[in-house]
Amino acid sequence: MAVERTLSIIKPDAVAKNVIGEILTRFEKAGLSVVAAKMVQLSEREAGGFYAEHKERPFFKDLVSFMTSGPVVVQVLEGEGAIAKNRELMGATDPKKAEPGTIRADFAVSIDENAVHGSDSEASAAREIAYFFAATEVCARIR
């Protein structure tokens, strides 16, 4: 399996619950390295641009409102099969359908406030990482 990078966002609901460290620990215990990270308060423009592919969906306005309701932690994770591994750790989008022990099963309350975001493909990972980080902000982890 190839070493990949993926974007992960700890959403406002999880930040407010003060579980950032617990979520990051799960990534690291699963063999993923954090190679870039920052806490940001997204503007409506930034959140809308990030989720532009959903612009015509009925939930778009609520999604943007939620993502701007408090700070988020945005990070780049790196590791073998990072995209699939991160999605497995997150669990199903709807926390009621998420496997026990996944991030969403443990920390999310609804399909709307579901604790985390993760890239779903190599193409989306590349696009999403570039949306939040300059190449110089992503640090190779060689030790």
Swiss-Prot record:
It is found in: Cytoplasm. It comes from the Bacteria. GO terms for biological process: CTP biosynthetic process; GTP biosynthetic process; UTP biosynthetic process. PROSITE patterns: NDPK, NDPK_LIKE. Keywords: ATP-binding, Cytoplasm, Kinase, Magnesium, Metal-binding, Nucleotide metabolism, Nucleotide-binding, Phosphoprotein, Transferase. InterPro entries: NDK-like_dom, NDK-like_dom_sf, Nucleoside_diP_kinase, Nucleoside_diP_kinase_AS. Its cofactor is Mg(2+). One of its GO terms (cellular component) is cytoplasm. Pfam families: NDK. ATP binds at residues 11, 59, 87, 93, 104, 114. It catalyses: a 2'-deoxyribonucleoside 5'-diphosphate + ATP = a 2'-deoxyribonucleoside 5'-triphosphate + ADP; a ribonucleoside 5'-diphosphate + ATP = a ribonucleoside 5'-triphosphate + ADP. The active site is at residue 117. NCBIfam families: PRK00668.1. Belongs to the NDK family. Homotetramer. This is Nucleoside diphosphate kinase. It comes from Azotobacter vinelandii (strain DJ / ATCC BAA-1303). The lineage of its organism: Bacteria, Pseudomonadati, Pseudomonadota, Gammaproteobacteria, Pseudomonadales.
